[in-house]
């Protein structure tokens, strides 16, 4: 007989066979199989357990499993190397206790060893067995009242689940296969037991090592921390009393998904907190979002601490306590999509944020893409202009040179979660993350449930209905299309629109749901300061303030009254906010616009606009902050002014281009031309290191290579044709417009912008060339070119309309009389006509000059010269 050794009883295979742990030294623990000497208990068998097999095992389990005990080996079977001996504590001997309860019997081959210390032990065992036999205990009594155990899985798992779902069932953990899968004996009644396989709900553990025990099986290595997770559960649950909650069937349809509750708590939470498992996303339907969220919180802490399977994870947690990242209140200024917003903080700073863990209808998805505008409109109506509470969840790093963006939880004042509201309505999907992802919404599982409910309820883009908005037309695409839409847009006096974009203080891009179209709109009767079109330009004073006020309308509902449309397809009229507030008056009252009447403006509105502007001037607000009212001039000064004769302005010029509409561009001969020649030479050297611009926009100052002479010129982009990769560029030193490929356009360095554009735009005074529709149009342009191009001319400025001068052109070699001017020569040659009186308002009328021109015109008419050859062609004047 060996000495007693202190050990820990790990597992009771039966009433008399155990797995024990013996500590060999400070670090090494040996596990071995050990059986009680001299006795045997009823056996568990595949074909059916012997009576009282469970009772014997349960008796031993309750007494010694999980507890320290003294173990002494009495003998060893040579063939199996199994040790047999005694297990005892300070209170009892296990074999003797089993015999006394009738749960074991002496082995037939066991005999007394007279004269040895074992003899007295054997005698005590015999006495214990005699006691059980005398009182007919256990196996010595009737066997009709024993436990019946069903070892096979339930024949109908779904029916079994339905019968026991929601109940708390007592049981014992029999075996542990992986960290997240156990075999449990359920106590359906005191004498009716059922063995089932339970997968832990809410957690997925790495696979442990598996050793094949038959040819049909395949051994496998553990996943990282797989054996550690299994051992974690073994030490806490193996042959322990637990409470089981069945929740659902496992995917295999045979085993069950459930909670395994130890007196210390749910084992799943302990696995997650130790980093030995990850949250199983697909268990949300069984557990519900509240439980899943609590599990994710536990998992997140393990990730941050890099425990277990998260040891090597790359975790980037934002400093939520940082001042710039704290929760803040803001107003929604723009809804870009159902997952991206722009909000304005209380300090006026606007920032772009994304709603955590959701995605708007994807353009690449054929089923989702048609609902993009409908989804955005749903959210816009709910939150635009409203105050919200923003909480940072995580920061998503920027990609493709884009900045990082804050992913946040946004709540309305009543506590409504915006992301949850959108997903419930079927206008966004929930992002599926990788299992090692830390960054996700704190209500991620609620979002998953909401998405599932929206799909089942056929809401939003899951409805299968036709999208509310499709095939939207751009009514301002061209002048022709805008005029086609004018009557339909004017049919409703106040047309309901949505302000899609703000171009300037008085210019907007609107969307009309009723007419299913977009269009450009400008406030009639006012002008606002011009904003800078690019970084190289400088806006007019108070342009930003005017634009800022106009942006308060962005994505808000408004009403517009359409009055007319201009030649660029922009509709003109009045815009009203809050149904009755004219926005033009608001701009005028704050000194951010000035009056500019129009022909059809009513006297009432004209007076109202001017009175509002006058009040702003008097209050010195906005652009009128330094306004000084004009003083009344003395009578003598007025008289002198009346008698003063205006000196005519003469310019030495050279024509640089003749446009198709009869206007022409000229350069003033002087220092400007000399500076331009130097600049053109420098541009030629810049061509050697030419690099096309990556981004080309309308209004951009550029250096462009002309296709006519392959030279480089300064210019301004007028129109971009993205489809053909070309742009219409005004070469503003010469006045010509060319279509130039993007590959021949580069940004213009600031050093080349100091010299102002050298070309001036002009038209001939008193006369007009035939229109492009005339058969004589090309002939007239050719004659004009022969008379004026490549010659030093003198231009007498007669007036101007905007930036277009009205001039009389003289060729010094022809003479200085008016009858010798190019204007008169064109009329005499029948290549131009005297303009009607209604078109002479932009320059001073010279009666003598007009008489000369009319004489030339009458002579050409009578002699059938030029376009008078077949009679009177002047019907085009009307």
UniProtKB/Swiss-Prot annotation:
Residues 695-755 form the Tudor domain. GO terms for molecular function: nuclease activity; RNA binding. This is Staphylococcal nuclease domain-containing protein 1. Keywords: Cytoplasm, Phosphoprotein, Repeat. The modification Phosphoserine is found at residue 316. One of its GO terms (cellular component) is nucleus. The lineage of its organism: Eukaryota, Fungi, Dikarya, Ascomycota, Taphrinomycotina. GO terms for biological process: mRNA catabolic process; regulatory ncRNA-mediated gene silencing. Residues 3-142, 167-312, 326-464, 493-626 form the TNase-like domain.
């Amino acid at each position: 007989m060996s000495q007693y050794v202190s050990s820990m009883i790990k597992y009771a295979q039966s009433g008399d066979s155990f797995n024990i742990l013996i500590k060999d030294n400070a670090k090494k623990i040996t596990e071995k199989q050990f059986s009680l000497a001299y006795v045997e208990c009823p056996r568990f068998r595949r074909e059916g357990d012997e009576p009282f097999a469970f009772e014997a095992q349960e008796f031993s389990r309750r007494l010694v499993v999980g507890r320290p005990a003294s173990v002494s080996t009495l003998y060893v079977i040579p063939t199996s190397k199994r040790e047999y001996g005694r297990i005892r504590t300070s209170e009892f001997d296990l074999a003797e206790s089993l015999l006394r309860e009738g749960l074991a019997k002496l082995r037939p081959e066991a005999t007394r060893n007279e004269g040895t210390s074992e003899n007295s032990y054997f005698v005590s065992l015999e006495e214990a067995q005699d006691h059980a036999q005398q009182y007919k205990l256990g196996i010595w009594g009737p066997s009709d009242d024993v436990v019946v155990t069903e070892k096979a899985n339930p024949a109908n798992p779904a029916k079994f689940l339905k019968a026991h779902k929601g109940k708390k069932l007592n049981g014992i953990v029999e075996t542990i296969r992986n960290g997240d899968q156990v075999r449990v004996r359920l106590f359906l009644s005191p004498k009716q037991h059922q063995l089932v396989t339970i997968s832990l709900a809410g957690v997925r553990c790495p696979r442990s090592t598996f050793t094949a025990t038959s040819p049909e099986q395949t051994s496998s290595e553990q996943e990282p921390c797989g054996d550690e997770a299994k051992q974690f559960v073994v030490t806490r649950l193996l042959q322990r009393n637990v409470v089981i909650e069945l929740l659902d069937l496992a995917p295999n349809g045979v085993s069950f998904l459930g909670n395994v509750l130890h007196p210390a708590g749910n084992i799943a939470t302990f696995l997650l907190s130790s980093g030995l498992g990850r949250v199983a996303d697909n268990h949300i339907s069984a557990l519900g979002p509240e439980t899943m969220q609590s599990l994710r919180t536990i998992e997140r802490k393990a990730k941050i601490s890099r425990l277990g399977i998260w040891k090597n994870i790359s975790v980037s947690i934002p400093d939520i306590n940082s001042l710039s990242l704290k929760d803040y209140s803001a107003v929604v200024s723009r809804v870009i999509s159902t997952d991206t917003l722009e909000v304005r903080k209380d300090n006026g700073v606007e920032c772009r944020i994304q709603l955590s863990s959701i995605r708007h209808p994807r353009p690449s998805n054929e089923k989702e893409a048609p609902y993009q505008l409908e989804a955005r409109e749903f959210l816009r109506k709910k939150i635009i202009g409203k105050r919200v509470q923003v909480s940072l969840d995580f920061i998503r790093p920027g990609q493709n040179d884009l900045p990082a963006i804050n992913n946040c939880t946004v709540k309305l004042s009543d506590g409504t979660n915006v992301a949850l509201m959108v997903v419930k309505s079927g206008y966004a999907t929930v992002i599926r993350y990788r299992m090692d992802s830390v960054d996700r919404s704190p209500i991620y599982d609620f979002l998953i449930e909401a998405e599932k409910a929206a799909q089942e309820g056929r809401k939003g883009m899951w409805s299968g209905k036709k999208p509310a908005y499709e095939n939207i037309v751009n009514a301002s695409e061209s002048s022709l299309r805008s005029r086609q839409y004018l009557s339909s847009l004017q049919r409703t006096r106040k047309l309901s629109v949505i302000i899609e974009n703000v171009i300037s203080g008085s210019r907007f891009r609107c969307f009309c749901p009723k007419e299913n179209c977009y269009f450009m709109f400008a406030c009639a009767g006012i002008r606002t300061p011009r904003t800078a079109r690019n970084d190289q330009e400088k806006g007019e004073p108070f342009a930003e303030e005017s634009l800022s006020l106009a942006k308060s309308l962005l994505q808000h509902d408004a009403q517009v009254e359409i009055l007319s449309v201009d030649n660029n397809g922009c509709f003109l009229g009045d815009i009203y906010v809050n149904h009755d507030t004219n926005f033009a008056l608001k701009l005028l009252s704050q000194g951010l616009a000035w009056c500019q009447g129009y022909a059809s403006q009513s006297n009432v509105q004209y007076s109202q606009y001017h009175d509002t502007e006058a009040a702003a001037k008097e209050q010195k607000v906005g652009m009128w902050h330094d306004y000084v009212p004009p003083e009344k001039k003395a009578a003598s000064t007025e008289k002198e002014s009346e008698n003063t004769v205006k000196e005519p302005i003469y310019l030495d010029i050279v024509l640089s281009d003749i446009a198709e509409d009869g206007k022409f561009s000229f350069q003033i001969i002087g220092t400007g031309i000399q500076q331009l020649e130097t600049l053109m030479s420098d541009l030629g050297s810049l061509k050697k290191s030419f690099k096309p611009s990556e981004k080309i926009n309308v209004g951009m100052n550029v250096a462009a290579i002309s296709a006519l002479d392959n030279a480089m010129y300064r210019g301004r982009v007028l129109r971009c044709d993205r489809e053909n990769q070309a742009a219409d560029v005004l070469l503003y030193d010469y006045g010509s417009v060319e279509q130039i490929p993007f590959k021949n356009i580069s940004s213009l360095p600031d050093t080349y912008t100091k010299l102002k554009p050298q070309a001036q735009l002009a038209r001939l005074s008193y006369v007009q060339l035939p229109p492009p529709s005339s058969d004589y149009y090309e002939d007239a342009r050719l004659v004009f070119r022969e008379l004026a191009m490549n010659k030093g001319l003198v231009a007498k400025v007669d007036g101007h309309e905007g930036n277009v001068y009205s001039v009389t052109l003289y060729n010094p070699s022809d003479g200085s009389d008016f009858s010798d001017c190019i204007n008169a020569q064109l009329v005499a040659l029948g290549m131009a006509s005297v303009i009607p009186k209604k078109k002479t308002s932009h320059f001073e009328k010279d009666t003598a000059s007009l008489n000369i021109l009319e004489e030339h015109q009458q002579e050409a008419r009578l002699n059938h010269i030029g376009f008078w050859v077949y009679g009177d062609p002047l019907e085009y004047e009307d």
